[in-house]
């Protein structure tokens, strides 16, 4: 196919679903997306969520009837405060197949190695910052110590009547491997043994690279083309583990449609120009902070 016949709009539409699929597959927090079903507004950066407030039962009086009580429901507007993006250039190619291979490799790796880790890190830091359960930071260096700390986290959520079903335990790689050492395994008939931990006490267990697992991160503005992404906030600690119930959090990620410009429209280089942009944010509901528990490392 001649270069002049490659349609930029069609190319963008072709790759958009692929980018979305990579995000869903690679993100450790994607499982929490959209569980609260917010209602979108015309403004792409605003979503509405329904918040309720109510009191418990009162005595029924045969003379006066039902006890009055405040039960209210309101729509609250939440603004997505993170507006991130990046432009890519791919040298001019003579045919669509070669262009597609180059672009797919470039953007696929960008989503996997840059976008997904940043989204996960931002969400974990947000949830850690809002967690009601937050014991004194400590190093967990033994398998028994890890189990004791996780038991305390579960007990804390139990005491707040947080539902047991559906809880998710996110653990740093150090904690995850200590946890593996605390549990015994049995050889199966074919002589293999699977030591991976996917569930513990009814909770899904997800291992998180420490590079995504902090109680605070700084987003780099990227004004310098050689810099971007995020880093651990000075004074904020690494996380050992984070236990939460998905109903306590809301996270939104809006991947704006890709913009693609052919070389003859690119004013800076003889190259295809691709622009990627995403609005996103994460929230913990004010009345559900008890459903989030974080254990921090000492540094």
What are these regions (language model features)?
Residues 15-23, 119, 123-127, 153, ...:
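Generic structural signal of hydrophobic/aromatic residues within well-ordered alpha-helices
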Residues 131-200:
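Extended, solvent-exposed, turn-rich assembly/linker loops in the middle of proteins
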Residues 64, 125-126, 130, 220, ...:
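Residue-level detector of alpha-helical recognition elements and their boundaries
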Residues 49-51, 73-135, 145, 158-173, ...:
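Long, contiguous amphipathic alpha-helices that act as assembly "spine/axial" helices in icosahedral shell
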Residues 2-56, 73-81, 87, 98, ...:
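Sequence/fold signature of self-assembling virion shell proteins
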């Amino acid at each position: 196919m001649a270069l002049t016949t490659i349609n930029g709009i069609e190319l963008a539409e072709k790759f958009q679903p692929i980018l979305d699929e990579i995000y869903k597959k690679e993100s450790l927090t994607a499982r929490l997306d959209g569980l609260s079903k917010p209602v979108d507004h015309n403004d792409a950066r605003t979503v509405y969520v329904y918040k309720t407030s109510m009191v418990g039962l009162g005595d029924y009086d045969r003379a006066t009837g039902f006890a009055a009580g405040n039960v209210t429901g309101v729509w609250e507007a939440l603004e997505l405060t993170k507006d991130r993006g990046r432009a890519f250039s791919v040298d001019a190619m003579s045919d669509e197949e070669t262009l597609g291979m180059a672009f797919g490799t470039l953007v696929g790796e960008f989503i996997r190695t840059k976008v997904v880790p940043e989204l996960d890190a931002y969400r974990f830091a947000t949830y850690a910052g809002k967690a009601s359960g937050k014991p004194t930071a400590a190093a967990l260096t033994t398998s028994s110590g890890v189990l004791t700390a996780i038991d305390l986290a579960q007990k804390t959520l139990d005491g707040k009547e947080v539902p047991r079903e559906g809880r998710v335990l996110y653990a740093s790689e150090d904690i995850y491997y200590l946890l593996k050492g605390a549990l015994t395994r049995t050889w199966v008939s074919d002589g293999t043994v699977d030591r991976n931990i996917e569930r513990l006490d009814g909770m899904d267990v997800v291992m998180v690279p420490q590079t995504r697992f902090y109680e605070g991160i700084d987003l780099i503005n990227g004004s310098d083309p050689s810099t971007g992404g995020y880093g651990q906030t000075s004074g904020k600690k690494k996380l050992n583990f984070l236990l939460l119930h998905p109903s306590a959090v809301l996270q939104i990620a809006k991947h704006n449609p890709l913009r693609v410009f052919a070389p003859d429209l690119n004013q800076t280089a003889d190259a295809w120009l691709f622009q990627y942009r995403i609005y996103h944010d994460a929230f913990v509901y004010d009345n559900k902070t008890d459903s989030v528990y974080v254990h921090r490392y000492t540094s």
